């Protein structure tokens, strides 16, 4: 049923939804990769589409920026539309010297400075991890496509403009592969409501070196990440 944030009809979404932060990236994926793609929701211009990829029904929808925004959309997709699998496909920043701009990262887990998972988990630490089945399929798809990936921890930050830049040194020490703003929240929502989740991110900028991609490139390219996510949906 429709919600305050999603105006799709019952059954409008496939069991698996790919979720970029940017709704225009969702539009790009639908127009570039999906056959018979249909716009199923557009509340607040947070576009969602359902179509077919190599014969497999799949949906793609934006989730906005930050854990509060993505938590709303993922929760409603799971509880109101019966979505089983959420695959975030987004951008992240790198802090380690061995992680380069445009590298693809698969988030095995996600640390965070947000308190939302503690609120969900009765003020205890919750290990926000990806579903192993989705993770394994993504790695297999990447290997089949010949696309190198890095698998490990992400850090989901509440603030884009950090007041504590020294924290990036701590992240580097602890082996964090990428800094973004949603994965830990999505993993928490999926765990709470019995769904599966995975985050695949492309490095859009390097926090230490200052190298970065353009806004247009972030919106309309990063195709390796998209191909991995889409091909992983085909695997059993």
Curated annotation (Swiss-Prot):
Keywords: Glycosyltransferase, Transferase. A purine D-ribonucleoside binds at residues 5, 180-182, 204-205. This is Purine nucleoside phosphorylase DeoD-type. One of its GO terms (molecular function) is purine-nucleoside phosphorylase activity. It catalyses: a purine D-ribonucleoside + phosphate = a purine nucleobase + alpha-D-ribose 1-phosphate; a purine 2'-deoxy-D-ribonucleoside + phosphate = a purine nucleobase + 2-deoxy-alpha-D-ribose 1-phosphate. Homohexamer; trimer of homodimers. Belongs to the PNP/UDP phosphorylase family. It comes from the Bacteria. It comes from Tolumonas auensis (strain DSM 9187 / NBRC 110442 / TA 4). Its EC number is 2.4.2.1. GO terms for biological process: purine nucleoside catabolic process. Gene3D superfamilies: Nucleoside phosphorylase domain. The record marks 218 as: Important for catalytic activity. One of its GO terms (cellular component) is cytosol. Phosphate binds at residues 21, 25, 44, 88-91. Catalyzes the reversible phosphorolytic breakdown of the N-glycosidic bond in the beta-(deoxy)ribonucleoside molecules, with the formation of the corresponding free purine bases and pentose-1-phosphate.
